[in-house]
């Protein structure tokens, strides 16, 4: 049985109770947080441009 799971997650993901051979490939793409020039109204806003975590899990039983 071959299960391929592609789950976008934010934060931590815990995997427990996995049996058999397991190949885990994590591709984390996260851009730097850019701060624009200070705005006189609110002192500038922190903008998180991209925060994406891709988890590819392959189970071979």
Swiss-Prot record:
Residues 17-35 are annotated as: RNA-binding. The keyword Transport applies. Keywords: RNA-binding, Transport, Viral movement protein. Residues 28-37 have a biased composition (Basic and acidic residues). Cell-to-cell movement. Displays RNA-binding activity. Homodimer. It comes from the Viruses. Disulfide bonds: none annotated. Belongs to the carmovirus double gene block protein 1 family. One of its GO terms (molecular function) is RNA binding. Residues 1-45 are annotated as: Disordered. One of its GO terms (biological process) is transport of virus in host, cell to cell. It comes from Carnation mottle virus. The keyword Transport applies. This is Double gene block protein 1.
């Amino acid at each position: 049985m071959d299960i391929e799971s592609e789950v976008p997650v934010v934060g931590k993901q815990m995997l427990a109770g996995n049996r058999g051979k397991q190949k885990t490939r994590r591709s984390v793409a996260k851009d730097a947080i850019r701060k624009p020039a200070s705005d006189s109204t609110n002192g500038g806003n922190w903008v998180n441009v991209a925060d994406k975590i891709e988890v590819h899990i392959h189970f071979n039983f």
